[in-house]
């Protein structure tokens, strides 16, 4: 693991060479490949040092980080073609990747918090530096202040634990459980609820997605939302007693919110906004599963987090490919694309069906496990879950049918073929999504 961290460190100077764009991208994929070979199915921590280590939860998310960051460079070819500060762009992506890897491999709660917050900086720069509309400033402010305000109580909670326990090591804290600490429970959990994002504190997400460039959207949907889930997975060993008492609040809000957000999806005309709201709906069900604190819930939420990272990121790539051709993200213009880009319709279909958890995607495995855990927690949730599953399929079909079928927009006079780069990009999103269900132990068996 240390060799990978050093490799990443030595990639920083490369980002300032003249023609290093594709070399850095190849090196990121090489990193992912080396990391895959290093898979050791250990359910205890594989230490690098006192502060850093890996277990199976971190492993999948770090691999996803490498993968998505490589694909981000592949998707942002326009930055390379128009020489739009491409060296700074590469530097930002590498900095973000470095922060994410350190976040997922932190063994100390404070180090985790530090890198968790630091990953916000390059994301903000991506949105402000390479976004499209002037409103990106407002989106950046939303992103920053939602996350920072929610994270302050977390910092205070961490210092309280340090004062109380004299240690912040995750492994030592595993042996302890806080009882009747309602304020501590709230302060430790709230930052992650905002990052997930939970319904009611989700307003920063659609804004950030709509204003971000394609790379910003990919990393936001792919990895940064998963930081919230990862933090909750790590924290809940401490908070089981309070969790049993109060989790039903968040589960209720998430499930009802998921249904409402699914209805909002059906009213969207902006491609990116629709995919962003669908992320909130998916994260609602992930959060509910996590908060049941059952075996199925934890493993299912992990599987759906990995699946959603690949699927959402792929959909944002598709929306961007259409945007580059049409010059608009509106569904009123992006219609009848089956006539315009026939080759891409297959990818639209595959990723939309992945988004509604059709077999054989990993989403299916995650969603079935989550349904299992949430229904076993309470029978009443079946009503909400039925609506959620139905509307999830409805907005995925709406996105596909509206964008691909129907009459083509009359302002378009030519056909457009995709490039090999775009097909490879979509293939590298879709293939792991469907292949991972064959190796589902990777997602389901990390918890003994």
Swiss-Prot record:
Source domain of life is Eukaryota
Enzyme class, broadest EC rank: translocase
Any one GO molecular function term: ubiquinone binding
Kindly state which keywords UniProt assigns to this record, in alphabetical order: Electron transport, Membrane, Mitochondrion, NAD, Respiratory chain, Translocase, Transmembrane, Transmembrane helix, Transport, Ubiquinone
PANTHER family named in the record: NADH-UBIQUINONE OXIDOREDUCTASE CHAIN 4
Describe the family membership recorded for this protein in Swiss-Prot or TrEMBL: Belongs to the complex I subunit 4 family.
Please report the name of this protein according to its UniProt entry.
Answer: NADH-ubiquinone oxidoreductase chain 4
């Amino acid at each position: 693991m240390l060799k990978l961290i050093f490799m990443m460190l030595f990639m920083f100077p490369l980002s300032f060479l003249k023609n290093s764009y594709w070399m850095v991208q190849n090196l990121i994929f090489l990193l992912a490949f080396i990391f895959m070979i290093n898979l050791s199915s250990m359910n205890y921590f594989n230490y690098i040092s006192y502060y850093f280590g890996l277990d199976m939860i971190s492993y999948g998310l770090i691999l996803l980080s490498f993968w998505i960051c490589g694909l981000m460079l592949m998707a942002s070819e326009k930055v390379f073609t128009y020489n739009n500060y491409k060296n700074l762009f590469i530097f930002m992506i590498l900095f973000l990747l470095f922060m994410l890897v350190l976040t997922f491999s932190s063994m100390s709660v404070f180090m985790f918090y530090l890198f968790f917050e630091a990953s916000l900086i390059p994301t903000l720069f991506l949105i402000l530096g390479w976004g499209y509309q002037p409103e990106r400033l407002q989106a950046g402010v939303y992103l920053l202040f939602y996350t920072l305000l929610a994270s302050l109580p977390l910092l205070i909670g961490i210092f309280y634990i340090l004062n109380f326990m004299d240690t912040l090591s995750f492994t030592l804290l595993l042996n302890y459980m806080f009882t009747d600490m309602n304020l501590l429970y709230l302060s430790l959990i709230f930052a992650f609820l905002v990052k997930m994002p939970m319904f009611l504190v989700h307003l920063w997400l659609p804004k950030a997605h709509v204003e971000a460039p394609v790379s910003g959207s990919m990393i936001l949907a792919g990895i940064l939302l998963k930081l919230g889930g990862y933090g909750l997975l790590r924290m809940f060993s401490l908070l089981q007693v309070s969790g049993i008492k109060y989790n039903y609040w968040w589960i209720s809000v998430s499930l009802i919110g998921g249904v409402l957000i699914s209805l909002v999806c059906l009213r969207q005309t902006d491609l990116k906004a629709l995919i962003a709201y669908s992320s909130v709906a998916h994260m609602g069900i992930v959060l509910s599963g996590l908060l049941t604190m059952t075996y199925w819930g934890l493993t299912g939420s992990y599987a759906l987090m990995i699946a959603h990272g690949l699927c959402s990121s792929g959909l944002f790539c598709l929306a961007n490919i259409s945007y580059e051709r049409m010059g608009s993200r509106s569904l009123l213009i992006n219609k009848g694309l089956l006539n315009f880009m026939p080759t891409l319709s297959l990818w639209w279909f595959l990723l939309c069906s992945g988004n509604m958890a059709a077999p054989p995607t990993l989403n299916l495995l995650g969603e079935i496990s989550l349904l299992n855990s949430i229904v076993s927690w309470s029978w009443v949730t079946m009503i909400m879950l039925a609506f959620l599953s139905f509307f999830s399929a409805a907005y995925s079909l709406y996105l596909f049918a509206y964008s691909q079928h129907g009459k083509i927009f009359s302002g378009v006079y030519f056909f457009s073929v995709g490039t090999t780069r775009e097909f490879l990009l979509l293939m590298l999103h879709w293939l792991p999504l469907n292949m991972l269900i064959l190796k589902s132990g990777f997602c389901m068996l990390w918890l003994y």
